[in-house]
Amino acid sequence: MYNVIKQEAPDRWVKELYFQTEFRAYLCALTKSKALMATYMVVDTDTNEVTSIVRHGKPLIS
């Protein structure tokens, strides 16, 4: 299970949606980020690991 989490403030993240697959969670985060010009991240609920971060519609690549 994967969470889509929105950044409301520099130190405040709010869980918004849950998805069964990482791909669907990523597409949702990407779409919401482009539409709202906000930062979203996808987190794996099993390992509590961040799988991706999307800032203003652009993926962050590390």
Show which residues each predicted segment covers.
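A short, exposed loop/beta-hairpin motif centered on an aromatic-Gly-Thr core
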Residues: 11-27, 32
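Short, mixed-charge low-complexity intrinsically disordered segments
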Residues: 30-62
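Short aromatic-glycine-(Arg/Gly/Cys) micro-motifs in beta-strand/loop hairpins
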Residues: 1-15, 41-45, 56
